[in-house]
Swiss-Prot record:
<protein>
    <recommendedName>
        <fullName>Large ribosomal subunit protein bL34</fullName>
    </recommendedName>
</protein>
<dbReference type="GO" id="GO:0005840">
    <property type="term" value="C:ribosome"/>
</dbReference>
<dbReference type="GO" id="GO:0006412">
    <property type="term" value="P:translation"/>
</dbReference>
<keyword id="KW-0689">Ribosomal protein</keyword>
<dbReference type="GO" id="GO:0003735">
    <property type="term" value="F:structural constituent of ribosome"/>
</dbReference>
<comment type="similarity">
    <text>Belongs to the bacterial ribosomal protein bL34 family.</text>
</comment>
<dbReference type="InterPro" id="IPR000271">
    <property type="entry name" value="Ribosomal_bL34"/>
</dbReference>
<dbReference type="InterPro" id="IPR020939">
    <property type="entry name" value="Ribosomal_bL34_CS"/>
</dbReference>
<dbReference type="GO" id="GO:1990904">
    <property type="term" value="C:ribonucleoprotein complex"/>
</dbReference>
<dbReference type="Pfam" id="PF00468">
    <property type="entry name" value="Ribosomal_L34"/>
</dbReference>
<keyword id="KW-0687">Ribonucleoprotein</keyword>
Amino acid sequence: MAKGKRTFQPNNRRRARVHGFRTRMRTRAGRAIVSARRNKGRKSLTA
């Protein structure tokens, strides 16, 4: 029985573009995410 390939193929540029700070700040919901993580005291706000 053949298994598929691994689904996580790390790529720093894509990671930043999809989950990065500038991307988060573009939308209201994204700003809410960053704000919630600030309030919670997260060491890292975004990827």
